Amino acid sequence: MKKKAEGMSLRETFAIHRRAARDMRRIAPGCFMPFILCAVVEAASPYAVIWLSARLVDELSTLRRPEILAKWVLWIVAVSAAAELLKAVLERWKNVRSELLDRQKEVLYTEKFLRMDYADCDRQETRDLFSQIRQNADWSGWGFAHLKLYYTQAVQGITGILGAAALTVSLFTRQVPTSAGKLTALNHPLFLVGILLLIAAVTCLGPALVGRAYSAWNTLAEQVCFGNRVFSHFVFMQPGDKEKDMDRRMYRQSELAEHYVRTVNIFGVGSPVAKASQTTVGLSKALAASLSAVLSGVVYVFVCLKALGGAFGIGSVTQYVSAVTTFSGNTALLLSTVSHMRANAEFLKAIYTFLDIPNSMYQGSLTTEKRSDRQYDVEFRDVSFRYPGSDIWALRHVNMRFKVGKRLAIVGENGSGKTTFIKLLCRLYDPQEGQILLNGIDIRKYRYDDYMGIFSVVFQDFQLICQPLGNNVAGSMEYDRDRARKALIDAGFADRLAAMEKGLDTMLYKNLSEDGVEVSGGEAQKIAIARALYKDAPFIILDEPTAALDPIAEAEIYSKFDEIAGDKTAIYISHRLSSCKFCDEIAVFHEGAVIQQGSHTELLADRGGKYYALWNAQAQYYTE
């Protein structure tokens, strides 16, 4: 998708920027105030110095009274020093608020992902859209980041125009004396009209040329963002990725990466970006700068001729020239800001396309009973499901009922629908056909958070965060330390926990602390299991719970898991069929359907069944 500056009207441009500004003020109140104040001081302080300098030059060119000269010098020094001091203070404040704004902007994105339906979150189109937003911001700050710039430029431009107008009025009202001869022609209204037309032309043409340059850049947005992804993946991120470093060294992947970076050539000589810089963008900006120089030259001639004719003193020359050129520059700044905003509007549109993704999953109002007897009955009734955008059914006509407090194993080949079954049970997705019932009621009628509270899940691709061990187990800042410690011991983490000097306060990983500890894949899996145990939900679901454990640790977990689970209903997904023997019931999935269901002994007795084939396929590697 190519971004075009002319894609949105001025009304739409201002509307979407007002919305963006409201959102930024909501998540970071007062965030724009230092930018406004800094812009006012930045724009106004030069005019004070210009006016004082003109008075000083007038005195130097006439009476040259020492006490008057000293007064003007002191005023110039004092005003300049005060302005610089004030700007330094405001700049500090501005930098602090800028960092806060950038951080809160990330909070806005994170909150959206957390509130979004998992089905939309998992959708590739959503991920691609968010990646595009990221690349736009990385490229040139497009999106929210430019709001700070627009506030600054708008206030600076308006303040500058008002200040310049105040200092320029007398240029056109003061007349050249009749004794000046031919120079009295400067009093003719046509000169005034001509100067004003020139100012208007430069003021309008300059921003138009700058807008043309922005438009040229925006047409390259997709290519530039792709180039950023290439550089981020192969140049910036790879060297610090220790998990990939062994493969990179062993298979000389750096050569492949270097070749790809050179082949893509988004930013190199002869690339579209380089050509745009040399042609449309470069020429547009050069012409804009040339027009400004022409205006300055004409104004200098006009002001000097009026001064030569005696309309005002020599000190006013610098005042008027600076004021007129600054007036034009600030007006151009305002217009170019509008052009820039029209370009940025398309990038904000992408952001709000993401932020406005609606939650379509039905939110029920019933509460799940907090049953002390944990008597929860779950039934899949003719459930069928396919992932968004897919024509293939991931699950088809699944019927199953859980026996409360029992152990259920789910087995099957890769892609048979095992993990999809768990996602539907946890209501990460809703089925297209059929119903999932909790105690006879469709789970969609329950409050979502309430329903989620009855499940503890260890997904195969679980994540631990760089925080203390106890916080990882509890999932909160405040927690029951004895309960967290017991969960870790039950999960088989006792020996490693005893070896940690800080115990539950041990920071995991070194991303945020040099004192952090690294844990192996098996140890991380034990922590994830402990996290599920700590939640103490009626249902505990383990997706490949021992995949990263060695056989001894696996045997230890399974040997005591019946005791650990207690009266909970436990559901396991496993490729190691030896782990299924301790389960009360086994469901065999194949191509999205449940084709067998029974105990280990019952299923193994069916020599023509899928379970028997899977069992013997694995058993041959453990027997001679």
Q: Where in the sequence are the language-model features?
A:
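Membrane-integrated ABC transporters
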Residues: M1-P46, P66-W72, L90-K94, R123-L162, ...
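Helix-to-loop junction immediately C-terminal to a conserved catalytic motif
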Residues: C426
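ABC-fold ATPase nucleotide-binding domain signature/coupling loops
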Residues: L437, A494-I527, D536, Y621-E624
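C-terminal portion of ABC ATPase nucleotide-binding domains
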Residues: K502-G503, S559, R576-E624
